[in-house]
Amino acid sequence: LNDDKKRKAFIERVGEMTLKLRNCAKPVIGMINGVTAGAGVNLMLACDIVCSSEDAKFIQSFVNVGLVPDCGGMYLLKETVGLQKAKELMFTADVISAQEAEKLKMVMHVYTKEDLKIETEKIAQKIAQGAPMAIMYMKKMLNKSYANLKDFLDEEALVQTFCLGTEDCKEGILAFKQKRQPNFQGK
């Protein structure tokens, strides 16, 4: 990448991966096993739920090569761990363990290497049992920034009004009354 236009185009394409993860209508579950560095950490932060093995390690390594984090890493890390901790992790390039990443809420669940895939799949299966449209709207609203609570409540009212008219809502209410699992169809 020997000119600014090419470098900028490359970085923009890399950033698009983050947006695709964040804007995907379905939940994205990250499963981390081993060392995750740089852009890998930032793409992980764009996932909705992250599970890792107990021996996983994470590093914001950009400063070691004279770069700032890409893939929205500064935004996502600050959003996840707070401003000061994000600065510390980026400025120092300290390696953090899976256990520390879990404490910082970068990772939601830590499992043994042997259980990682099975347990992550259990989470995915549990989510898949939910109403697809409701989950899609929850993800969309949780990922969106609102100026204030009133703006959020206005959008919530629109989305909830729509959801109340869906076949999934009718099925969910009927299943609740009949004390059975709902069979959602995404309608």
Where do the language-model regions lie?
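Short C-terminal tail/terminal secondary-structure segment
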Residues: 181-187
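Juxtamembrane helix-entry segments on the extracytoplasmic side of multipass membrane proteins
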Residues: 151-154
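Glycine- (often His-adjacent) and acidic-residue-rich active-site loop
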Residues: 1-20, 36, 66, 147-148
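Short clusters of hydrophobic/aromatic residues that line enzyme substrate/ligand-binding pockets
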Residues: 1, 77, 184
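Crotonase-fold acyl-CoA enzyme core
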Residues: 19-133, 157, 161-166, 170-174, ...
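Short amphipathic alpha-helical interaction/hinge segments
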Residues: 131, 135, 146-149, 184
